[in-house]
């Protein structure tokens, strides 16, 4: 190989390496995209939403890095999340990505009574909205809707069917341990979250497992959209859900 061609190849490889390094640094330190695979956060997030998650609000842990290599423990520049934040975290048992709403911080006492969320013995204020038909695996069902307002200033809409599952609508008091957090889905009847032990739900989530805070729904498609059917990229696009701040 001529010297000039060899130098050109080396420079090209250097440029590629720099580009990859910049991409990885951006993904680890700043922002990362996620897709929503389940209905557990409806109506806030729906299957097919493409969400942008910021990686820096709570500092960084090994779970900020792809494949969660055991390079260090704990968090670097740790900052506390707020109740009401929508957060991506690693499941404490199997390490899969989860997205739920934070309602309990260390020391909090969390409980559900007749479907009402209580934090430290105080009922979270909520306003009833008109019921909404929701498509589920059991067909279209009518869900109650409520606006919950946390003391952090966050408000959001939840789905609820208090007549369906007494186990999730009437719980024991959960005392959140130090260094852990308590998460629930906005779709209270279809979310395996901190109300359930890790074998079925997620239990208490260690601070180290937090990945980042969901900021935007960037783009969104209906469930019928398919990578292998290009026309559905347009026919199933949900423009009304795109570019939405969370």
Go through the PLM ranges and name each one.
Residues 14-29:
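Hydrophobic membrane-insertion alpha-helices, especially the h-region
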Residues 2-10, 29-35, 40-246:
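Soluble "head" domains of membrane/secretory-pathway proteins
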